[in-house]
Amino acid sequence: MGKQGLNIGLIGTGNMGGEIARIAPEKGHNIVAAFNRNRPLSEDSFNEEIDVCIDFSCPECVVNNVCMLANWGVPLVLGTTGWTARFAEVRAQVISSEMAIVHAPNFSIGVAVYLRIVREAGTLFNQLPDYDVFVHESHHRRKVDSPSGTALAL
């Protein structure tokens, strides 16, 4: 990357996509293409300027997006949740194409630390048969996936 930022293809222009579009230029990166339900990723939408795609779209779109980007040789940061029922299919595509991909249910450093703490707590609670652990989450009314990918990771 050096001093020049990345040229980003943004897949999904909802809440997270909007935040990425807002923050990327502040960090020196360029949004060179944006895809959404009205303008989905397709063979006709290839843009050779794209260095990496960031996907916060919908679970139903993930397999198509991964296949398309693998064919183009474009790395992917995947933040979309709710698609893991098709994990084996995505994994096979990634392996066969040697695609570069990073995926997580949540990219927050705070959540990453919290997940590690929860793992440790789980080990301790497993030794206490009188305790049942559960997760309760609440969100704004427009939250699309419930339970969230973060809650499922916990």
Language-model segments: which ranges?
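Rossmann-fold dehydrogenase core element
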Residues: 75, 90-108, 128-135
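Short, acidic/turn-prone active-site loops that include or flank metal/cofactor-
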Residues: 36-40, 80-84, 107
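Glycine-rich adenosine-cofactor-binding loop
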Residues: 7-20, 110
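Short, hydrophobic beta-strand segments that form beta-sheet elements in well-ordered domains
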Residues: 10, 31-37, 53-55
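Rossmann-fold NAD(P)-binding glycine/threonine-rich loop
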Residues: 80-103, 112-121
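NAD(P)-binding Rossmann-fold cofactor-contacting core
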Residues: 19, 23-43
